[in-house]
Amino acid sequence: MALSKNNLKEYRENAKLNLKISDVAATSFVTLYCHAIESQSNDPILNDPKAVEITNELNKILSNSENKLYQDLVNGKLKKELVTHIAIRARQYDRYVNDFLRDSPEGVVVNIGCGLDSRFLRIDNGKVIFYDLDLPEVIEIKKQFFEENDRYHFISSSVLDHEWMSMVAEHEGPFLFVAEGVFMYLNQEDVQSLILTLQSEFPGSELVCEVFNSLWLKEPLRSIMNFKLQRQLHLGKDAIFNFGIRDSKEMETWNTGIEFLDDWSYFDSDEEKLGWIKIFGWIEFIRKTQWTVHYKLN
């Protein structure tokens, strides 16, 4: 059951237990707060009132924490550029889902590494079957703010424990798997195993996932990225990027039948809030530092 006034006090009293989450899981708070901040800005890129509601409640809990990341979130100390990028990304992933549902209104969507995102509320067409998948500690928090129904379900599991697929496989499909800001924290062997299993278990499904340029995983660029994640964003030591690719079509080489459909970068957006940084979009290395690929898993 979602959080109500009657159980809010109890939830706050137990908050220290509920908020003991891994470094990688804590990144979901950054995404959530970016959504909330942008939603309250002038001419917002993303309209996410649920994020505003959740952060208003979390502020009452996180304000008592000595965690530097949590203090930054409560005090709104997130860089404007980060907020803009996260909001543009969420809007684009919503568009991917809406495009899928336009062709398959009763399709099945699995939001891998969902965090506290309210994508289901933003894209619900009244027919979609939607699964939010994330680590148990994240889903436990999410249950305080969202309610499941006959078309909206939680899966409390690591994406690497492939047993979660049996629940999704109960449906006929078609299937769309989205992984926004997830794969870069995993190892290549795990990402490859996951995608090959999705291809085997859900033939004909689509995958939309964010990827990172593997060149940035080599020194000295790797140290620069880790500095940004841990010293500037104050994420934990385990929240580091491990997986990357060089080319949008690279996953096609993993197995016959993996078909590249398209890709997307922040620089493809005509959003005015990107500002001067848009001038670097013509540089391929910059455009594809962190971007999104779309595949058909035949």
Feature locations, PLM:
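Rossmann-like AdoMet
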Residues: 2-110, 114-155, 171
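Short amphipathic alpha-helix with an adjacent loop that forms part of the alpha/beta core around
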Residues: 162-172
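A short SAM/SAH-binding and catalytic strip from SAM-dependent methyltransferases
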Residues: 174-189
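A short, conserved alpha-helix within the catalytic core of class I
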Residues: 185-201
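Conserved beta-strand signature within the Rossmann-like core of class I S-adenosyl-L-methionine
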Residues: 198-215
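Short, glycine-/aromatic-enriched active-site segment of Class I SAM-dependent methyltransferases
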Residues: 221-238
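Short alpha-helix
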Residues: 238-265
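Core SAM-dependent methyltransferase catalytic element
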Residues: 266, 275-298
